């Protein structure tokens, strides 16, 4: 079956709700989405578990699985130069890079729009943060 986003590669660095949900929709539409996670894993992996219920599902994290359905996961340590190089290499081949990192963090890891556009001028660089990029709460993640 042909999907609308076949042949689209998305590199995603994010956690919590909005941005992972957007990535899941892109995967639903046929994009190949590679989720980059830190060595400690996405903090959402353990947020939705219900360990107090007596069920085989008590270790199943529904929210994480819903928000990350259809994605591949790759562990990358962005605090190391090799980690940044891996993500930049992936972005050189991707059509979309999406993240919910504040601009300062994007710059720290050399994943800001200017740096990635120099590597891939046709890349769509999408930032989705909880409080936007301007205004009094823009500094909040």
What label would you give each PLM region?
Residues 1-141:
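N-terminal helix-loop segment corresponding to the beta1-alpha1 unit
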């Amino acid at each position: 079956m042909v999907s609308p986003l076949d042949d689209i590669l998305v590199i995603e660095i994010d956690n919590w709700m909005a941005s992972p949900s957007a990535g899941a929709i892109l995967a639903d539409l046929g994009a190949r989405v590679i989720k980059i996670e830190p060595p400690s894993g996405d903090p959402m992996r353990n947020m939705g578990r219900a360990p107090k219920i007596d069920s085989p599902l008590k270790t199943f994290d529904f929210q994480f699985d819903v928000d990350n359905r259809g994605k591949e996961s790759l562990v990358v340590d962005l605090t190391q130069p090799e980690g940044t190089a891996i993500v930049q290499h992936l972005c050189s081949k991707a059509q979309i890079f999406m993240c919910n990192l504040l601009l300062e963090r994007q710059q720290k890891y050399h994943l800001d729009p200017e740096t990635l556009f120099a590597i891939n001028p046709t890349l769509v660089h999408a930032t989705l943060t909880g409080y936007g990029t301007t205004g009094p709460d823009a500094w909040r993640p």
